[in-house]
Regions:
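The AdoMet/dcAdoMet-binding core of the Class I SAM-like
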Residues: 1-63, 76-82
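Short "lid" loop at the C-terminus of a central beta-strand within the Rossmann-like core
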Residues: 37-38, 71-75, 103-105
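Conserved Class I S-adenosyl-L-methionine
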Residues: 53-54, 78-102, 113
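Soluble small-group transferase modules, centered on the S-adenosyl donor enzyme superfamily
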Residues: 98-179
């Protein structure tokens, strides 16, 4: 973690995220939502709903960003969850970016939905992204830079097509469960 957990700007909250966001007036620059799959009667299925994304949006500072784990994106499993989560986030946030990365623990690619109240970060040039990183980060990053951002947000055509066809919006009344 290269000292990131020691940064005074970081606060980790280990709690029921839905209940926490309902009960706090705190505002955040960045929220990272790393949750288990939405299993029926599981602890996290409400964290995939429009109601949760609305709470999340209302707790972000202007220009704030929320990144959420959004399910598998490989050709065999992407329709389970990913496009519905992205469509749900897009029903709440003005800017939603699709991203995927290989996750060794799952031996597969995994999707992430980046929701923003500000301009679309994927519209930034490689040079502008690198400049912003240099302003905010001491030392050199081993993985992330402007080229990496461009690559991570250039998802395969089948994912873009799935999102274009997607009409599901996940709600408390119409939850999404994965098998």
């Amino acid at each position: 973690h290269r000292g990131s957990f020691d940064d005074p700007r970081l606060t980790l909250h280990y709690a029921d995220a839905f209940a926490y966001l309902e009960s706090t007036d705190e505002r955040f620059d960045v929220v990272i939502v790393d949750v288990p799959d939405p299993l029926e009667e599981g602890p996290a299925y409400l964290l995939f709903t429009q109601e949760f994304y609305t709470l999340l949006r209302n707790r972000l500072k202007p220009g704030g960003v929320a990144v959420a784990q959004s399910g598998p994106t490989g050709p065999a499993f992407y329709e389970q969850c990913f496009s519905a989560v992205a469509n749900t986030a897009a029903s709440v946030f003005p800017s939603v970016i699709l991203s995927e990365a290989f996750v060794p623990a799952f031996a597969s690619t995994w999707g992430f939905v980046i929701s923003s109240l500000g301009p679309d970060p994927s519209d930034l040039s490689v040079e502008e992204t690198d400049r912003r990183i240099a302003e905010r980060v001491t030392g050199e990053l081993g993985y992330f830079d402007g080229i990496t951002l461009h690559g991570m947000t250039s998802v395969p055509k089948y994912l873009r097509t799935a999102l274009a066809r997607e009409d599901r919006i996940i709600t408390k009344a119409n939850p999404l469960y994965v098998p």
